[in-house]
C-alpha cells in the first residue's frame, strides 16, 4: 500500500472514531450493584481454620435424620452413592489407578465439608438447611467415615479441631512465603 493510500485509510479511521462520540443508547439493564446486605447474605466462606463458621451445633444422630430426609435420594443409604457421588469409604484407594475420593478418604479439612454442604446442598434447594442442620449432617458424614464418634457434637469450636485422614497428603501449590 502506498503512502497516500495509508494516509487516506488513517484519515477515514480517525473520522469514523471522531464521529462516533459517546453513545446515547441506553444499556440493556441486565443487572445492578448488589447492596451491602445482599453481599453479606452470600458472604458465607469458611476457612480451614474455622474462620467464618456460624454459631450452631449438631450431632451424628441429628444428622442421620436430616440425611435421610434431604440427602439420601442422591447420595444413597449411609453415603454409599447412587445416583450421585459416594460420601463414605475409599480409604484404601487413593494410591490406586482408580481412587475413590470421598469426604473421608480425600477431603483435607472438615470445615470444607461444612462449607460445601451449607452452600450447595441439597442440590435442588441450596442454602435451605439451617446452620444446626449443616453441623448435624457434617457430624453424620464424619461419623460414617470413622473420623468422629457417634455422640461427638460439631460446632464452630469443635469442627476445626477434627483432623481429616488425608490432611497431610496435599502439596501446597503456593506455600506461605516467609515474611
Regions found by a protein language model. Give the residues of each.
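N-terminal Sec signal peptide cleavage junction
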Residues: 19-22
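Gly/Gly-Pro-rich "capping" loops immediately C-terminal to redox-active cysteine motifs
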Residues: 64, 80-118, 122
Amino acid at each position: 500500500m502506498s503512502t497516500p493510500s495509508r494516509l487516506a485509510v488513517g484519515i477515514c479511521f480517525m473520522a469514523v472514531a471522531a464521529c462516533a462520540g459517546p453513545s446515547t443508547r441506553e444499556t440493556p439493564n441486565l443487572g445492578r450493584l448488589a447492596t451491602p446486605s445482599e453481599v453479606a447474605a452470600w458472604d458465607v466462606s469458611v476457612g480451614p481454620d474455622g474462620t467464618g463458621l456460624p454459631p450452631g451445633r449438631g450431632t451424628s444422630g441429628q444428622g442421620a435424620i436430616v440425611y435421610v430426609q434431604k440427602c439420601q435420594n442422591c447420595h444413597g443409604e449411609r453415603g454409599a452413592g447412587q445416583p450421585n457421588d459416594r460420601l463414605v469409604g475409599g480409604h484404601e484407594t487413593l494410591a490406586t489407578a482408580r481412587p475413590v475420593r470421598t469426604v473421608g478418604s480425600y477431603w483435607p479439612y472438615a470445615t470444607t465439608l461444612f462449607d460445601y454442604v451449607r452452600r450447595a446442598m441439597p442440590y435442588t434447594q441450596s442454602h435451605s438447611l439451617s446452620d444446626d442442620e449443616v453441623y448435624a449432617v457434617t457430624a453424620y458424614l464424619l461419623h460414617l467415615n470413622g473420623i468422629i464418634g457417634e455422640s461427638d457434637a460439631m460446632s464452630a469450636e469443635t469442627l476445626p479441631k477434627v483432623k481429616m485422614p488425608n490432611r497431610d497428603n496435599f502439596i501446597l501449590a503456593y506455600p506461605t512465603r516467609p515474611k
